Amino acid sequence: MTETTTVHLLRHGEVHNPAKVLYGRLPGFRLSTTGEAMALAAAEWFGGHDVTHLVSSPLERAQQTAGPLAEATGLAIGTDDRLIEAGNAFEGMVVGGAGGVFRAPRNWWKLRNPFQPSWGEPYVEIAARMLAAVEAARDAARGHEAVLVSHQLPIWTIRLHLEGRSYLHDPRRRECALASVTSVAFEGDRFAGVTYAEPAGATPSDAVPGA
């Protein structure tokens, strides 16, 4: 009988970011008080699940999000660089408003190719590293469940890849809320589908896109 394995992709909780910058891979961005509550809600959501493997992006906000689940399950938090946030040329800049990066003519050349995209890490490279991380977690948790804590764009990109959809998309329409769970099911090595849940509810409408 073919064994079922589920790899859950948990997005980190809300980050303390009063300046509303696109923080990307920058250090020093940790969870807000609300984000810490989101991490607890996610850990509670996994209660009763057969989680035997827990791995996180190396970034602080992801490690913090993994913390409550590690405490609840007794699992050590592994770190996988393949789960890190996507590289972005606008890292550290303000995205929205009158002074946002999209309003400055000097930035328009970077926006020339939304298919790649020209402003950051190529989607094909994000998908490749995330797929490798997901398959490694599947192999480590055969017949059980694994949780990988990552970031919105990497999670959304691997979902698009697995479902055979175009990488070209509107970031505002990603189904990947803060502290959400995108669950990837496998029957043996075969991809069997994706389900989605929001243990902490929907992301606020004024959140920084892609954060």
Predicted regions, residues:
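Short beta-strand scaffold positions
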Residues: 56-57, 128, 149-150
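Active-site signature of alpha/beta-hydrolase-fold catalytic machinery across serine-
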Residues: 68, 157-161
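Short, active-site-adjacent cap segments at secondary-structure transitions
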Residues: 16, 61-63, 86-87, 154-156
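Active-site-proximal alpha-helix that buttresses catalytic centers in soluble enzyme cores
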Residues: 5, 10-77
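Acidic, low-complexity terminal tails and accessory targeting/binding regions
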Residues: 1-5, 75-79, 85-97, 139-144, ...
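Short glycine/proline- and acidic residue-enriched helix-loop micro-motifs
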Residues: 104-125
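Generic structural signal for well-ordered alpha-helical scaffold segments
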Residues: 40-47, 127, 131-139
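Generic beta-sheet signal
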Residues: 7, 144-152
